[in-house]
UniProtKB/Swiss-Prot annotation:
Subcellular location: Secreted
Ranges where the Kazal-like domain occurs: 6-56
Pfam families tied to this protein: Kazal_1 (PF00050)
UniProt free text on domains: Avian ovomucoid consists of three homologous, tandem Kazal family inhibitory domains.
PANTHER family in the cross-refs: OVOMUCOID-LIKE-RELATED, SERINE PEPTIDASE INHIBITOR, KAZAL TYPE 2, TANDEM DUPLICATE 1-RELATED
Record-marked site positions (Reactive bond 3): Q18, E19
UniProt cross-references to InterPro entries, sorted A to Z: Bifunctional_prot_inhibitor, Kazal_dom, Kazal_dom_sf
Record's keyword terms, sorted: Disulfide bond, Glycoprotein, Protease inhibitor, Repeat, Secreted, Serine protease inhibitor
Native species: Penelope jacquacu (Spix's guan)
Name under which the protein is recorded: Ovomucoid
Domain of life: Eukaryota
Length: 56
């Protein structure tokens, strides 16, 4: 089972679209989409990782 990765190299972004493609972070928080998740990854200095796709 390979680790799940999301490419956040083009983040942070000042605004995210309101698309609903939830991701579950390693903080056990559900993020609405890749953009909001990647912004949180940047804010966490890379300590936040993706647990899985879908809601936590």
């Amino acid at each position: 089972f390979a680790p799940v990765n999301v490419d956040c190299s083009d983040h942070p972004k000042p605004a995210c679209l309101q698309e609903q493609k939830p991701l579950c972070g390693s903080d056990n928080k559900t993020y609405d989409n890749k953009c909001s998740f990647c912004n949180a990854v940047v804010d966490s200095n890379g300590t936040l990782t993706l647990s899985h796709f879908g809601k936590c």
